[in-house]
Amino acid sequence: MGCLFSLFKGLLYTALLLLLLAGGFAGNMAYEELFHAPWDQILGIENHRRDLSQIHAMENRYGWQSVTVPSEDGTRLKGSYIESGNRNHRAVILLHGLYQNRAMCVPYADIYREMGYSVLMVDLRGHGESGGEYPDWGVHDIEDLNAWVDFLKAKDPSMQIGIHGISLGAAMALLYSGSKEGEAMKFYVADSSYASLMELGREKIMRYTGDDRLVLGMDVLNPFFQAALFVHDRKLLRDLDPLVQSAKARSPLLILHGKSDTLIPYGAAEDLFSEAGSPRKEL
């Protein structure tokens, strides 16, 4: 009887080990898919991330400064800097949307320049002329934004800095708002951000494939995916979720979102507004 019990226990441990190994393998595949999946097709958006003709033409025409800074891991980041002529120690960092580049921010730059701000339009990692082969979804964006803040502070130690992001850039701004370094920013504007990376993935994959089994599979794989994320990047999903991170924010926050937005539901903005920790916030 003891031998049978030992055999059963051994088989159970073996099965559990195989299950964990299979889960770990699948979780790592899910991690790779986060970065390499054709999100432009899944989300139904155009891919202009490497089309730099417009921004280069405007830099040449108006004499905007093309700038390069290294991030903490050595990745080269690229941006365009437009200095205000009135030296009022105010600047804004503009962050573009998914599969776009800093050229998307030009209309917003005009608004801030009229208000007397110096403007820094940057290419997010994996976009434009910045290093990286794919969207980063916030894994390194706090460090990347630190590099840009350091760039502005080196120009003017008294610089008061705000961050305005659109779509993916809005999500990155919200992640930064909850960081220790982000507390020093004077304001944040989040235009059309998603609230939860996992919820965004669930909704868009369901719409893209029409197969609810994949959504169920995401839930089953979630612990293994998070393990892979931690092994690779020392991050968990909560570190990449604007809803979670903006709850720590203390700087003034303006959330913008169109009620007819078909890419990111307006409810995401309502959730973000409800949970944001900023004492001064508007939707």
Where are these regions (language model features)?
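Conserved alpha/beta-hydrolase
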Residues: 111-131
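The serine-hydrolase catalytic nucleophile loop
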Residues: 98-111
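Catalytic histidine neighborhood in serine/cysteine hydrolases
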Residues: 274-283
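Alpha/beta-hydrolase active-site loop
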Residues: 135-156
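Conserved alpha/beta-hydrolase "acid-adjacent" motif
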Residues: 262-268
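An N-terminal hydrophobic leader/cap segment in hydrolases
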Residues: 3-8, 13-70
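Short beta-strand/loop motif that positions the catalytic acidic residue
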Residues: 248-250, 255-257, 261
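Hydrolase active-site cap/lid region
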Residues: 178-235, 244
